[in-house]
Amino acid sequence: MTTSAASWRSDPADPSVASARERALRQRSEGRVRITASAFGGVTRLTDLAEGGALRARLPRGGPGLEAVIVNTAGGVACGDVFSIEAKAGPGAHLTVATPAAEKVYRSDGLCADIQVRLVAEAGARLDWLPQETILFDRARLRRRYEIDLSATASFLSFEALMLGRLAHGDAMGEGHLEDHWRLRRDGALIFADALRLAGPMGALLARPAVAGGNRALATLLYVAPDAEARLEEARALLDAARCEAGASAWNGLLCVRLLAPDIETLRRDATSFLMAFRNAPLPRVWAT
């Protein structure tokens, strides 16, 4: 017998509350988006776009290269959600990927939300991955995986910011689960692997000096390009005016900047100033809305 979602919820023979796994599987959101940008005579154009589920791509006009804004029509991320994003900049193309607002990750009944991101920049391409911050609510559970494949002559810039809890609303993140896995390859060789895992009492974990020193907002910027190491002193000089804790290092053609702040407003202000100066270009317009 086939049972609809409505009858499943109201069936008196079932427990009044389904297990977390059953509930998540029935209510979860899924979304997929794939974008390819190609260069034609020095102009970057969209050459492939595939969308499915809750994810959509919008292409505002103006600015250098092609700008794609990924929209989550589900209004946030909940337990059991599965999202996949792929973006590719073909030879000589310039693609910027952003999001229209902060992404909210809501309280989970047990399952992790999964987000998979795959980014590719081919010979001479430039790819900027610039989503706005992700905010984790109390008891949120999030797992993200990033796979980046670059040509040796490509340029890649990414910025990812996290806020654990909603301090502006007086909501601390007491418990939760966060995993971030990064794998970055240049011409097929692994040059950067990073893994972050925080699980359990978030307040106690973040208070540790070796973790966040009591800060609740954290961000990582990566820049991979032929001139990455040569720009280290420039990056450090730009960070001198930062109000948050910040540091930069460079090795093997990669520049990494880490930022920590007590709140997302401080981190966002410093990050915005840094990104605008370092990129020598305005941020995506959605950052100002």
From Swiss-Prot:
InterPro entries hit by this protein: UreD
Pfam families the record matches: UreD
Gene: ureD
Disulfide links within the chain: none
Family, similarity comment: Belongs to the UreD family.
Gene Ontology, cellular component aspect: cytoplasm
Quaternary structure and interacting proteins, as annotated: UreD, UreF and UreG form a complex that acts as a GTP-hydrolysis-dependent molecular chaperone, activating the urease apoprotein by helping to assemble the nickel containing metallocenter of UreC. The UreE protein probably delivers the nickel.
Keyword Transmembrane helix: no
Cell location: Cytoplasm
Keyword terms, alphabetized: Chaperone, Cytoplasm, Nickel
Function description: Required for maturation of urease via the functional incorporation of the urease nickel metallocenter.
Protein name (database record): Urease accessory protein UreD
